[in-house]
Amino acid sequence: RERLQLDADSKVPTEYVSTMYELMHLAFMTDSTRVATYQIASMGDATTLGGKFPQLLGIGKHLHGLAHDWNKAEGAEALGKWDRFLAEQFVTFLDRMRNTPAGPESDATLLDQTTIIYGCSNSTTHTNKNYPLVLAGGRGLGFKHGQYLKYGEDTPFANVFATMLQQTGVTNRFADSTAI
């Protein structure tokens, strides 16, 4: 197994993002935490580390520029390349989780016992309306996957978190959730 490079070069986005995902994997694997969050960048981001990743990858503009050029041919292609980069990094993380046993005497994987929510870019709106999300893992917690769900505009995003918390027995409600 390769050694984790904790001094990942922030000028090499693939190395940097991979290191962050590997740290989360190790934290779950060693039961150092039960919760982790990682935001690479915001679509409104032009100046921070993650906002510059598309440029460093040779995709084009900073992240905020990609968001505003989605309706131009070259902009849509660049945004697609950025989304693909993010998705590939996420899949690598899921594969690590899938290939790690949940425990020494368990047939389940770490992915089976973990619920992961992933959101990707949302173009020019810079809001959480019509936001593409993936809910992965949690098979051992009773989640059923392999489906596409579309909700109305009045459905609070908090319903997703409420469902995740219900499946783990933490609580039935979360923020402005409406589902029970």
Regions from the language model: what does each represent?
Residues 1-180:
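Ligand-binding pockets and gating/stacking loops
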